[in-house]
Amino acid sequence: MIHLLHWHKNNVLHGGSFNNENDSRSNRSRARSALLLAAICTAALIHPLAVAAAGSEAAIITPASADPSLSLADDSSIRKSAVSAAVPQSLLHFTEDTVEQLSAHVPFTAWSEAELEYTPLGPGTHGWLVTVTDEGLPQGYLIISASEDGGYVLSEYGIGGTLPFSLGPLEQRLAAEGLTDPEGSLPQGSLIRKRYTGAPVWEVTLPNQDTLYISGFNSELLPNVSLASGTLDRSGISKGVVAAGSAHGWSADAPSITEHRPDPYDNLQWLTSSSLTARSSSELRRLLQKHPSLVFKSKGDGNAAFGAPFSLTGWQRWSSVSGSAADAAAIYVAIPLRNTDTTRFLPAPRLVGQGKFYVYPGKSN
């Protein structure tokens, strides 16, 4: 397996320009950013934790006097090569083992020769986004979270060309909301941070304004209350999911997924039907065996945080070889991302008890 390890320190993005690389002012800002990064990396040679500390900083607000031409999407080669060492070895091993297991089965077989790129997720680097590319083309992603015991868990993974936290949709949303000037710049002192709350979320803080939350997939504005509704509880994060640990080893079964990708908004008759009961991951799996397409609707005001309502079209089972009955298996359910070719896989326990399940009407059942 060929891995090109990139470590992106742009978990926190600051007020500045979204101009393209051909703009001379943007190029000058990239040069300044590269020099700054070089200084950070030089410091890391003296103290290896310097880069890791910089990446784990959850919120560094750009001063009002900062250069307004600062690029939000600096992707210089010096960043790629110099700071990859900040990715913990334990995370690398867990990710590589996970990708190896997935690549043994369709539709993940292209991942066998994939390149992996790592980006920390805030606050406090409690998560990592790992993007998967093959010959420069996006193939999928993994989101890995830190557990309370210091290990790692597989919080989510996905297959397809639409990746979380893509800058393009975010740029369009900020412009549509009138938050950027004609040159694509945010007000000085602005802060953009990647968050994971059960779904990818951009947290946008602007001077003298309420914090905005924007979907990390489709750039839809989310209600503020949704962030708390979907926030992961780290105390129970390792239950019923693929987890790293010296006593753990996991084997992925071939996923069972229907070809049909129903959209809950195309046929709302499911709203008039009775909800189904799933009190555990195994019960949810049995529902999917009986009804190939279900719809999940979150309870309360948590729909936006989960990205719900959404369809469930299958599952993938992971078997533990740790010998522990409590960790015998983990079930991840398949969720087609609307209007894309991407399918998300979420741990079944994340949904059980957090909403209701309905049978999707139509040909799939």
What are these regions (language model features)?
Residues M1-R28:
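N-terminal secretory signal peptides that target proteins for export/translocation
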Residues S65-L121, I159-Q188, G240-F306:
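Short, non-transmembrane alpha-helical segments in secretory-pathway proteins
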Residues H105-E148, S190-S215:
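Exposed beta-strand-loop-beta-strand "reactive/processing" segments of non-cytosolic proteins
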Residues L142-T180, I214-E259, L337-N365:
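A short, surface-exposed interaction/processing loop segment used at functional sites
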